[in-house]
């Protein structure tokens, strides 16, 4: 099979940095899908992305589709010819459609008779004839939320397109894509190297970009260079660079030839909480902060330039000049905020609406204060500290710093509380009330902080559900899904003895007459229990295990988790499948029972296998009772797994629905007791 390397590059104006990698990988995936759909073989696909280009290189691409054998069946021989042996009109029409005569058709014999058939070999199309449409289709399927038009063109793309290059080996593929005539011209760096130049062969890419255009097209290589050089620059200062992967990839998407440099700022700014300085450095300027070995912020930062002059001093001074006003603002806001105690911000919360039907932020604060105290009492936290933290929880939203740097909410509350002399647990709780902020985020460290974090999230869930504004589809403006998962994670991972029904009932009572949904408690609890499914599926736990536990609707998250772990473990037993099937059978039998079911009567057992199961069930009922009380569900199901043999023997030798009512009633009692033992943990009849 003859192959050539294929290159497609789309040269654009600066692409959105946060979307660049996603666009590049989607482009490569779409190209791969197009090739596979066309039946074109290839060895490997590589993708490239810089601020001003998306490119895909396909290695060892077949230069033509493979030939295909086709077989088109026609009419049955019996109906293809008339009594004189002449082809019928139906046979002639079929043959004409195949481009042959009836006489040229083959015949095939099947179990349903003999049929006319046309067999032929269809040559595959040359790859070069397919590529333009494939690339256009791949581009049209890119995840572009807001495409744009430019100049007088009618086509749309994420940014204006200037060049399109398609090379199959050394052959330029002719055509037009996105309103641009395909050419073998690519553009270099905006300031370094040649502005544009010709590429003669797909194999020259991406090296020709580096050699002539001063562009490193490989995204992963640029990322590695930035990471390596940033770590080295920080180490030279005796520090460690704070390099989060999201910011690293964003910076990688901003430069075509990275040059990692270090700049500094005045040490006086270190009197401002580090989080505020870091917020503006990372969020606004895309800089990497540097910390010493003890975790203290150093008066230096790392930035990445897209140019590489012999003397970088002007670039360094320029970045220092840019960041200085932002740090000065943070310093001013901090000093201004310190002139007023955090608690003195409470009256201002009355001027900010949380939600029209649910009141102001002050109303929410009062509810959080009360609910924090309720939760603290239940989990053994300091009630007064929890209530104090709840009272102060939203005060920092009124400060100058948080108004300007919104992502510092919580952490600035912590710093201001410390300055005011609040208890350390109270101060820390103000920061940790928002934890977990995202999937996999850390949880609050203290029970006081857990109390406030839970109260805040439950108040939001109860309030929004209470006015009928629960999430619909992808719309979740109050982030209720995240709040619900946060509640579950805190309770489960901290092993807190809390019941969702009790918490939501307490929360509901704090809203007075504001709530209109009378089913709010059930709605919120069901919503939170439903979030367990997504959480456990991410952990790889089978859906039927989750459903088996959900069927029992345990409303204590820590208890729910213990049941899920137990059922998941139970599924590994050899006896699990048989016992699940037996429980399905028991459920069906009991559903059809037409008499009252009482307690097991051993003296009424007439069959040996019947008595054996009855005795086993009664014995296990006593054995598992203390295990259930301790929520040791794994031990419960391990014990119940021993019932497989007596259960199998029972169904093999005993007629449950005996004609004698007393026998039938007792046998139903045995099965009812058996079922109830398993239902103490979960409905294992739902296991597949």
UniProtKB/Swiss-Prot annotation:
GO BP annotations, alphabetical order: arginyl-tRNA aminoacylation; glycyl-tRNA aminoacylation
SUPFAM superfamilies to which the protein is assigned, alphabetical: HD-domain/PDEase-like
Coiled coil: none
Gene Ontology CC entries for this record: cytosol
Places the protein is found: Cytoplasm
Catalytic activity entry: tRNA(Gly) + glycine + ATP = glycyl-tRNA(Gly) + AMP + diphosphate
Keyword Aminoacyl-tRNA synthetase assigned: yes
Gene Ontology terms for molecular function: arginine-tRNA ligase activity; ATP binding; glycine-tRNA ligase activity
Gene3D superfamilies cross-referenced by the UniProt entry: Isoleucyl-tRNA Synthetase, Domain 1
Enzyme Commission numbers on file: 6.1.1.14
InterPro entries (alphabetical): DALR_anticod-bd (IPR008909), Gly-tRNA-synth_bsu (IPR015944), Gly-tRNA-synth_heterodimer (IPR006194)
HAMAP family in the cross-refs: Gly_tRNA_synth_beta
Quaternary structure note: Tetramer of two alpha and two beta subunits.
Family membership noted in the UniProt record: Belongs to the class-II aminoacyl-tRNA synthetase family.
Protein name per its UniProtKB record: Glycine--tRNA ligase beta subunit
Gene: glyS
């Amino acid at each position: 099979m003859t192959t050539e390397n294929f290159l497609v590059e789309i040269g654009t104006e600066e692409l959105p940095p946060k979307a660049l990698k996603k666009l590049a990988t989607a482009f490569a995936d779409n190209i791969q899908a197009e090739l596979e759909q066309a039946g074109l073989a290839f060895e490997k696909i590589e993708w490239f992305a810089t601020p001003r280009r998306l490119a895909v290189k396909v290695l060892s691409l077949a230069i033509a589709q493979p030939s295909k054998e086709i077989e088109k069946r026609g009419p049955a021989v019996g109906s293809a010819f008339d009594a004189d042996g002449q082809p019928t009109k139906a046979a002639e029409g079929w043959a004409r459609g195949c481009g042959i005569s009836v006489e040229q058709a083959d015949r095939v014999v099947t179990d349903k008779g003999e049929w006319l058939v046309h067999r032929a070999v269809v040559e595959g199309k040359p790859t070069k004839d397919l590529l333009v449409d494939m690339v256009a289709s791949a581009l049209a399927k890119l995840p572009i939320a807001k495409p744009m038009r430019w100049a007088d063109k009618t086509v749309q793309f994420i940014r204006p397109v200037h060049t399109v290059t398609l090379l199959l080996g050394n052959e330029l593929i002719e055509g037009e894509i996105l309103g641009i005539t395909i050419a073998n011209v690519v553009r270099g760096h905006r300031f370094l190297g040649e502005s544009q130049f010709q590429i003669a062969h797909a194999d020259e890419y991406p090296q020709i970009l580096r050699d002539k255009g001063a562009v490193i097209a490989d995204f992963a290589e640029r990322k590695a260079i930035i990471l390596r050089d940033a770590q080295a620059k920080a180490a030279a200062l005796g520090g460690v660079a704070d390099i989060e992967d999201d910011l690293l990839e964003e910076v990688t998407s901003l430069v075509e030839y990275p040059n990692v440099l270090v700049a500094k700022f005045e040490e006086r700014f270190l009197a401002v909480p580090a989080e505020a300085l870091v917020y503006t450095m990372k969020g606004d300027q895309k800089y990497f902060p540097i910390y010493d070995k003890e975790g203290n912020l150093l008066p230096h930062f790392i930035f990445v330039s897209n140019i590489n002059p012999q003397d970088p001093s002007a670039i360094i001074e320029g970045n220092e000049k840019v960041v200085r006003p932002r740090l000065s603002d943070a310093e001013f806001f901090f000093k201004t905020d310190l002139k007023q105690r955090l608690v003195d911000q409470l009256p201002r919360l009355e001027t900010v609406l949380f939600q029209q039907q649910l009141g102001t932020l002050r109303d929410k604060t009062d509810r959080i204060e009360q609910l924090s105290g309720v939760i603290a009492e239940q989990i053994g936290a300091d009630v007064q500290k929890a209530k104090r933290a709840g009272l102060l929880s939203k005060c920092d939203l009124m400060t100058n710093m948080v108004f300007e740097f919104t992502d510092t909410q919580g952490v600035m509350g912590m710093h201001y509380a410390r300055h005011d002399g609040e208890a350390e647990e109270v101060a820390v709780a103000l920061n940790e009330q928002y934890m977990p902020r995202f999937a996999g985020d850390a949880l609050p460290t203290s029970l006081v902080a857990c109390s406030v974090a839970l109260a805040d999230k439950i108040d939001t869930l109860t309030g929004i559900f209470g006015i009928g504004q629960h999430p619909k589809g992808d719309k979740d403006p109050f982030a209720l899904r995240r709040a619900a998962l946060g509640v579950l994670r805190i309770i489960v991972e901290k092993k807190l003895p809390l019941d969702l029904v009790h918490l939501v009932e307490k929360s509901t009572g704090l809203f007075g007459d504001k709530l209109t949904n009378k089913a709010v408690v059930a709605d919120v609890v069901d919503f939170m229990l439903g979030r367990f499914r997504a959480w456990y599926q991410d952990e790889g736990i089978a859906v039927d295990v989750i459903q088996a536990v959900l069927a029992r609707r345990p409303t204590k998250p820590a208890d729910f988790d213990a049941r899920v772990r137990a059922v998941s473990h139970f599924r590994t037993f050899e006896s699990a499948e048989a016992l699940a099937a037996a429980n399905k059978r028991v459920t069906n039998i009991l559903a059809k029972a037409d008499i009252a079911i009482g307690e097991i009567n051993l003296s009424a057992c007439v069959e040996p296998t019947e008595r054996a199961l009855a005795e086993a069930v009664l014995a296990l009922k006593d054995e598992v009772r203390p295990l259930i009380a301790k929520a040791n569900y794994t031990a419960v199901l391990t014990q119940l797994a021993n019932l497989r043999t007596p259960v199998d023997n029972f169904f093999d030798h005993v007629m449950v629905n005996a004609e004698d009512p007393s026998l039938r009633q007792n046998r139903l009692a045995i099965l009812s007791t058996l079922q109830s033992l398993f239902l103490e943990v979960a409905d294992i009849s739902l296991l597949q």
